[in-house]
């Protein structure tokens, strides 16, 4: 399982405060804790106004790289920000993210196609200009368009992490059945592709979130999930991931 550490994100109040105060030690401690807990990548999201985002991401990336040499998932909703911020990374990481929305793919995929950026990967969300499709069929249509673009630019499937966009269980009509269908279909079509998800989204606004997250991880991994945006310092969750890999013969 590819673990993308989620704990350096400006949408978290304590991280937002550290960013505002330029508290480098706080960012470094979070990066080091995730690195020591088994993260594969450290996600770095500023969640500040776009005019401040590139400079803020530079500061955050510099802090992270002072304490770990793990690759970074550079996280921004703006493709323009990503095309600048990735330059601050010392080694190839992940562009987080593109989607079927607007021209994001046409800004990021050409960068990834450049010889000097061959090691970079990307998270691709199954949404488009209409928003998040409601059915598995429509999400898979977005997926097909993304993969057509990947072929056009010469981006191999093993450099792509497809995010089927897990939504809150409390607003879902069919639990996670649709997500499982999407994950299974993507995995069957492209055995070498990566499939990721923000694990904690599923349990938002629900009691006993931990148990719901656990159940989702097992079902999603069985369907083909091999990447996760999660808290690697959560030993119970990480242990569950390793146990599920063993049970599926993936360890």
Regions found by a protein language model. Give the residues of each.
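Active-site mouth loops of central-metabolism enzymes
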Residues: 3-29, 96-103, 129-137, 202-210
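Alpha-helix-loop-beta-strand connector modules within alpha/beta enzyme cores
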Residues: 6, 52-90, 176-197
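Active-site-proximal loop/turn and secondary-structure-junction residues that shape catalytic pockets
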Residues: 8-10, 46-50, 78-80, 99-101, ...
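Conserved, mostly hydrophobic/aromatic
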Residues: 34, 75, 85, 162, ...
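Glycine-rich, proline-tolerant flexible connector loops at the mouths of alpha/beta enzymes
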Residues: 35-70, 164-176
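A structural motif
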Residues: 38-39, 69, 90, 120, ...
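Catalytic beta/alpha-barrel core
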Residues: 43-50, 70-78, 93-104, 126, ...
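Catalytic alpha/beta core domains of metabolic enzymes, predominantly
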Residues: 106, 116-251
């Amino acid at each position: 399982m590819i673990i993308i550490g989620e704990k350096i994100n400006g949408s978290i109040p304590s991280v937002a405060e550290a960013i505002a105060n330029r508290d480098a030690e706080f960012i470094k401690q979070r990066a080091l804790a995730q690195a020591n807990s088994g993260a594969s990548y450290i996600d770095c999201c500023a969640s500040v106004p776009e005019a401040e985002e590139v400079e803020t991401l530079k500061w955050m990336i510099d802090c992270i790289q002072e304490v770990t040499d793990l690759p970074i998932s550079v996280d921004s909703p703006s493709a323009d920000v990503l095309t600048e911020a990735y330059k601050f990374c010392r080694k190839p990481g992940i562009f987080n993210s593109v989607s079927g929305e607007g021209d994001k793919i046409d800004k990021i995929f050409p960068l990834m196609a450049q010889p000097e950026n061959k090691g970079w990967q990307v998270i691709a969300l199954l949404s488009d200009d209409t928003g998040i499709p409601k059915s598995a069929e429509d999400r898979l249509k977005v997926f097909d368009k993304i993969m057509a673009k990947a072929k056009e630019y010469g981006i191999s499937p093993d450099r792509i992490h497809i995010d089927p966009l897990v939504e809150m269980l409390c607003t879902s009509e069919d639990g996670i059945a649709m997500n499982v269908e999407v994950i299974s279909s993507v995995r069957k079509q492209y055995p070498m592709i990566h499939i990721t998800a923000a694990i904690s989204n599923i349990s938002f606004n629900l009691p006993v979130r931990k148990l719901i997250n656990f159940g989702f991880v097992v079902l999603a991994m069985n369907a083909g999930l091999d990447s996760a945006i999660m808290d690697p310092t959560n030993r119970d969750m990480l242990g569950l991931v390793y146990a599920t890999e063993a049970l599926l013969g993936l360890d």
